[in-house]
Amino acid sequence: MSDHSHKENTPSNFIRAIIEKNLAQNLYVNKKWGGSPGDAKHHDKGNVDIAKIRTRFPPEPNGYLHIGHAKSIFLNFELAKDFNGVCHLRFDDTNPEKETEEYVKSIKDNVSWLGFDWSGHEYHASNYFDFMFEAAKSLISSGHAYVDQQSADEIKENRGTLTSPGKNSPWRDYDIGYHLNLFNEMREGKHKDGSMVVRAKIDMASPNINLRDPAIYRIKNIQHHSTGNKWCIYPMYTFAHPIEDALERVTHSICTLEFEDQRPFYDWVLERLKENSLLDDPLPKQHEFARLNLTYVVLSKRRLIELVENKF
């Protein structure tokens, strides 16, 4: 686990200070924007981005927003405004189980009600599924990912603990062609839910458990609210998130402290895909802030859904 104590003494405007420093260093002066999200080749054909920075508010459309989300909304939109940038409204719809168009509409209404305009920059993670599939294949091809046929319980048991290393999967070192074939079979719907997952190949002895070969793709034979039955495999959020940021040319990926331990994996994904020529610099950087906690206030999507459904 990370020690968050250093965050408590960090100035409240530390993200603003980071942005000012990045701009003074001219980190984004040659950053190109292809007019829409895309890979390295797409943006290379574009012009220099007129947006000095790009941020995003990335809710998952699996419930109603609560007051806790307002902090992230204000932070991302106001920072973009103050630094002559753009804030994207992105729906992280990578898990089809509980996501619906009703929540998409509700979230858009809430953001508008707060007075913010995403100016045509509304994006959906599901629009990037084709790229994410190719990205996962690229990682397998370069020896940085594999298909694991262990059960979920076996994977959990072999992950290790905070004080003991994990164990390599028996499938980890099978040849690349074997894993590519299995992944294509997963895509074609030839395997059942839970029978296998694609995992990043990093380090099962890492002191950061999030780097012990995390899953990046799983099988879910569920209809997606946007893509229908086109896909039966879906990317894990922690794999999809950095890719979405990079495709959208986000410069500052601002999230709550709970994702601090995930930052090394966020960077790992981007660096590997840059090595494979799918992404290019400047890559987005993740920055964390403390989440909003209030007493006597509902700060849970699940609880809000219960209140709405039961007409409270």
Placement of each model-derived feature along the sequence:
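Non-catalytic terminal extensions that flank enzyme cores
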Residues: 1-64, 85-87, 187-188, 195, ...
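Active-site cores that bind ATP or allylic diphosphates and position pyrophosphate for catalysis
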Residues: 64, 89, 93-95, 101, ...
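Active-site-proximal, well-structured secondary-structure segments within enzyme catalytic domains
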Residues: 48-51, 134, 158
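Proline- and acidic/polar-enriched loop/turn elements at helix boundaries
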Residues: 34-35, 92, 123-124, 151-152
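A glycine-rich helix N-cap at a beta->alpha junction
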Residues: 103-129, 135-138, 143-146
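N-terminal catalytic cores of NTP/NDP-binding nucleotidyl/phosphoryl-transfer enzymes
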Residues: 11-19, 27-108, 223-256
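Surface-exposed charge patches
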Residues: 21, 78, 109, 137, ...
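Secondary-structure transition/capping motifs at alpha-helix termini
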Residues: 25, 78-86, 110-119, 246, ...
